[in-house]
Amino acid sequence: MDIAGSLCNASEGPVLRPEARVSGNGDLQFLGWNVPPDQIQHIPEHWLTQLEPPASMHYMLGVFYIFLFCASTVGNGMVIWIFSTSKALRTPSNMFVLNLAVFDFIMCLKAPIFIYNSFHRGFALGNTGCQIFAAIGSYSGIGAGMTNAAIGYDRLNVITKPMNRNMTFTKAIIMNVIIWLYCTPWVVLPLTQFWDRFVPEGYLTSCTFDYLTDNFDTRLFVGTIFFFSFVCPTLMIIYYYSQIVGHVFSHEKALREQAKKMNVESLRSNVDKSKDTAEIRIAKAAITICFLFFVSWTPYGVMSLIGAFGDKSLLTPGATMIPACTCKLVACIDPFVYAISHPRYRMELQKRCPWLAIDEKAPESSSAASTTTTQEQQQTTAA
């Protein structure tokens, strides 16, 4: 029996590539066995030497992505709906929250491509589907990182300069436009193959930029995009939130020292003792989301560096699918972090969806909060 016949008997469908040799035990093919010959050129050679995973792994990931798609679509859809239609939430600062939700929503739009490929066990939608998948992922991933940095910048101004907030709608819109423009080159360059290209990875069901081709241009692209899309936003996030934490600690220390001089237990009201201020709660939500961004994208960044500069044998199809899934998971979790931590969003959600049984107390009036803040600052200054 010839090789093609052996492969047909070992697979559940027709083998389009006879050169996808049968493995030693005779019951598994190499990846790409069901890819048309005219599509093979788009797949890095590294993956064509890896064994095809069991069909159950494809189906399990497909079901997992169905869950991610539903949760992300509903969660981010609600954030976009409420933040864009509620007057109470229509503030310059929340323009960044809305922008992040848009990026996360876009991220989930590529899930149907992955799901279709998974249930067809490979590169079913071909190079066209791959380019769409990777372009969406690049825009949404890089955009989410830079938006998280912008949120950190805004939170720093709100908390350290509460009486001199200089964020306006115009400035917020300009910053969001800059973020979108910042993402564009990292999508257009590989999409047009001017610099690098988008290729399938892992089980050939997802796509990203090429980090496996062994040449200088690929290594330069990987190093450049790693710096500008991951290192830069991460450093900005760390700086902004370290400044916020430092300011909060120094402010609390000053209040305690002043209270001690005045022989009182605390300068804060009973309301402030029982709960954090709205600004701090929002900052906590932002810190959580930035932490999720770092945790979810770090494995992917490390994987791409290994592919470009390290030992490629470490990159098995199964190992590369783990970071590919974790970086999608954050887009699903983000909206629920805000649902838990953002007080005004919770109030609006409670009003529009009472069946969710959210119990969020109305915050103090802005005037009262402003008066309290002013008194604290005056007392601290007097010290």
From Swiss-Prot:
Glycosylation site positions: 9
Residue numbers on the Cytoplasmic membrane side: 83-94, 154-171, 249-284, 342-383
Membrane association type: Multi-pass membrane protein
Modified residues (N6-(retinylidene)lysine): 328
GO biological-process terms attached to the record: phototransduction; visual perception
Transmembrane segments: 58-82, 95-117, 134-153, 172-196, 221-248, 285-308, 317-341
Region (Disordered): 361-383
Localization (cell): Membrane
Pfam families: 7tm_1
SMART domains: 7TM_GPCR_Srsx
Family: Belongs to the G-protein coupled receptor 1 family. Opsin subfamily.
Further remark: Each Drosophila eye is composed of 800 facets or ommatidia. Each ommatidium contains 8 photoreceptor cells (R1-R8), the R1 to R6 cells are outer cells, while R7 and R8 are inner cells.
Protein's name according to its UniProt entry: Opsin Rh4
Organism from which the protein derives: Drosophila virilis
Lineage, broadest ranks: Eukaryota, Metazoa, Ecdysozoa, Arthropoda, Hexapoda
